Amino acid sequence: SAALAGTIIAGASLGFQILDKVLGELGKVSRKIAVGVDNE
């Protein structure tokens, strides 16, 4: 049904937003680690 499809799409888009945020945070952490290694 259309309602189910809408729910799935909303859930998928929310999932992508969360994933994007998590990947962004991991990217910051790995840059910090890389900078820390360079500084030693």
Curated annotation (Swiss-Prot):
Cellular component terms (Gene Ontology): extracellular region; nematocyst; other organism cell membrane; pore complex
UniProt-recorded Gene Ontology molecular function terms: channel activity; toxin activity
Localization terms from the record: Secreted; Nematocyst; Target cell membrane
InterPro entries the UniProt entry points to: Anemon_actinoporin-like (IPR009104), Cytolysin/lectin (IPR015926)
Annotated region described as Plays an important role in the hemolytic activity, given as residue ranges: 3-12
Key words of the record: Cleavage on pair of basic residues, Cytolysis, Ion transport, Membrane, Nematocyst, Secreted, Target cell membrane, Target membrane, Toxin, Transmembrane, Transport
Pfam families: Anemone_cytotox
Keyword Transmembrane found: yes
A biological process from GO: monoatomic cation transport
Span list, region N-terminal region: 11-30
Family designation: Belongs to the actinoporin family. Sea anemone subfamily.
Comment text on domains: Composed of a long N-terminal alpha-helix and a core region rich in beta-sheet structures. Before the pore formation, the alpha-helix binds the lipid membrane, partitions into the lipid-water interface and stabilizes the monomeric molecule on the membrane. Finally, it traverses the bilayer, thus forming the transmembrane pore.
Subunit architecture: Octamer or nonamer in membranes. Monomer in the soluble state.
Function: Pore-forming protein that forms cations-selective hydrophilic pores of around 1 nm and causes cardiac stimulation and cytolysis. Pore formation is a multi-step process that involves specific recognition of membrane sphingomyelin (but neither cholesterol nor phosphatidylcholine) using aromatic rich region and adjacent phosphocholine (POC) binding site, firm binding to the membrane (mainly driven by hydrophobic interactions) accompanied by the transfer of the N-terminal region to the lipid-water interface and finally pore formation after oligomerization of monomers.
Name of the protein described by the UniProt record: Cytolysin SmT-1
Organism listed in the record: Stichodactyla mertensii (Merten's carpet sea anemone)
